[in-house]
């Protein structure tokens, strides 16, 4: 299997790709604990990868359970992300084609009329519509994050079970209807009037895990703060009208 995209948690926590050799994962974990994001990027380039997805820590599973030990302020992640993106842009300017995955997704939304298929940035939310997760026991969840929540006894986003429920019951039921109604950014408080609304989306599963309901509260929502900050930074870079930066960005989304 060829893997061209890997995901990292920058800051104080890091998860390497499961497809990488354990020795490589150990090395990347060691570098990440020191906050050496540039070294991590260099290591992926050295290994022949051309794509990295810089992610903040997600509020699911063990990451949520041990949040007090491993979490970091979202402002710290945003600062690290900008530094990482700047470094990746410089690599591209020097002739190394290398994509930052989240920026590429946002740029496609910002610069083209085409969808990305990224479930976390859809309106209404893509969970249960653009995809669903079938677990080993027949349980069906709206997303993998919903499955992770179920591991910790939160079954709110379980659509049903293939051994007990029909397709119509699961995918045309009250739960999925409520998710759709609660995740249209065009009418959500804090989203409907946001300048970035056309390029963004809702994540009811994350909102429930982080803030206790599907709608969430934008002023304290970390995903909202992170996404807006990154979009703002991308627009700042575009406003420079730098031919090299524009060429690089378009190469990421073609």
Role assignments for model-derived ranges:
Residues 2-8, 15, 20, 27-137, ...:
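Radical SAM enzyme [4Fe-4S]-AdoMet core and its adjacent flexible, acidic
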Residues 150-254:
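Flexible mid-to-C-terminal extensions adjoining Fe-S/redox cofactors in radical SAM and related proteins
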């Amino acid at each position: 299997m060829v893997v061209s995209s890997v995901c990292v948690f920058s800051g104080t926590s890091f998860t390497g790709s499961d497809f990488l050799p354990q020795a490589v994962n150990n090395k990347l974990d060691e570098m990440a604990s020191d906050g050496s994001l540039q070294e991590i990027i260099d290591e992926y380039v050295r290994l022949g990868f051309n794509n990295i997805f810089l992610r903040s820590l997600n509020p699911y599973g063990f990451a949520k359970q041990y949040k007090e030990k491993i979490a970091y302020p979202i402002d710290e992640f945003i600062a690290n992300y900008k530094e990482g993106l700047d470094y990746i842009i410089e690599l591209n300017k020097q002739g190394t084609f290398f994509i930052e995955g989240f920026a590429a997704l946002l740029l496609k939304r910002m610069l083209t009329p085409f969808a990305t298929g990224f479930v976390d940035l859809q309106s209404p939310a893509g969970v249960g519509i653009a995809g669903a997760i079938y677990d080993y026991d027949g349980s069906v969840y709206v997303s993998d994050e919903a499955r992770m929540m179920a591991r910790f006894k939160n079954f709110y986003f379980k659509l049903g079970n293939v051994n007990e429920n029909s397709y119509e019951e699961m995918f045309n039921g009250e739960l999925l209807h409520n998710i759709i109604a609660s995740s249209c950014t065009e009418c959500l408080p804090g989203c409907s009037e946001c300048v970035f609304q056309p390029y963004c989306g809702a994540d009811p599963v994350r909102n429930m895990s982080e803030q206790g309901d599907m709608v969430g509260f934008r002023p304290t929502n970390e995903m909202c703060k992170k996404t807006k900050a990154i979009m703002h930074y991308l627009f700042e870079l575009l406003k420079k009208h730098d031919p090299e930066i524009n060429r690089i960005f378009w190469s990421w989304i073609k």
